[in-house]
UniProtKB/Swiss-Prot annotation:
It holds the Pfam family Ribosomal_L6. One of its GO terms (cellular component) is cytosolic large ribosomal subunit. This is Large ribosomal subunit protein uL6. The keyword Iron-sulfur does not apply. Part of the 50S ribosomal subunit. The lineage of its organism: Bacteria, Bacillati, Actinomycetota, Actinomycetes, Micrococcales. Keywords: Ribonucleoprotein, Ribosomal protein, RNA-binding, rRNA-binding. It comes from Micrococcus luteus (strain ATCC 4698 / DSM 20030 / JCM 1464 / CCM 169 / CCUG 5858 / IAM 1056 / NBRC 3333 / NCIMB 9278 / NCTC 2665 / VKM Ac-2230) (Micrococcus lysodeikticus).
Length: 177
């Protein structure tokens, strides 16, 4: 039995979970999320807890068991508290500013780089810090990764877009004469 998969998911007050065949729907104060269960996996709702089960010990079933449990748990967490990632823009002349719901970066290119906010994602800008927030953990992480990809941190000078608290492995420059 999967150590993560066998743990029940406790449903907090104010969150409504509906299981309809192979669809799990979670509704809470911050919004609603849906997920379709993979074929061999089943989920049951009893006494304020969701339990995820698998029919057999085949390799595919075992691998999907813990994954499905964690995805449902993240949905419950997302509709109650939400998720956020912080990014820092580091470097001379590197800036970020909010343009309505979207962002505009100056990252040393000959043009400003616009970033549109996907559905369900909000951006907050404080100086050179950007906070990406939303209820879907995967979407928040993917949006933050796409922003970081615009100008990855340089290993020589450390300039670029990085996650808050990320340690950049610096390289020594040329030795010279």
């Amino acid at each position: 039995m999967s150590r993560i998969g066998r743990l029940p998911i406790t449903i907090p007050a104010g969150v409504d979970v509906t299981i309809d065949g192979d669809r799990v729907s979670v509704k809470g104060p911050k919004g609603q999320l849906e997920h379709s269960l993979p074929t061999p996996i089943t989920a049951t709702l009893e006494e304020g807890q969701v339990t995820v089960a698998r029919p057999d010990d085949e390799r595919e079933s075992r691998s999907l068991h813990g994954l499905t449990r964690t995805l449902i748990s993240n949905m419950v967490e997302g509709v109650t508290n939400g998720f956020s990632k912080q990014l820092e823009v580091v470097g001379t002349g590197y800036r970020v500013q909010a343009k309505g719901q979207d962002l505009e970066f100056a990252l040393g290119y000959s043009h400003p780089v616009p970033v549109k906010a996907p559905q369900g994602i909000t951006f907050t800008v404080e100086g050179n810090r950007v906070t990406v927030a939303g209820i879907d953990k995967q979407q928040v992480g993917e949006t933050a990764a796409n922003i970081r990809k615009l100008r990855r941190p340089d290993p020589y000078k450390g300039k670029g877009v990085r996650y808050a608290g990320e340690q950049i492995r610096r390289k020594a420059g040329k030795a010279g004469k």
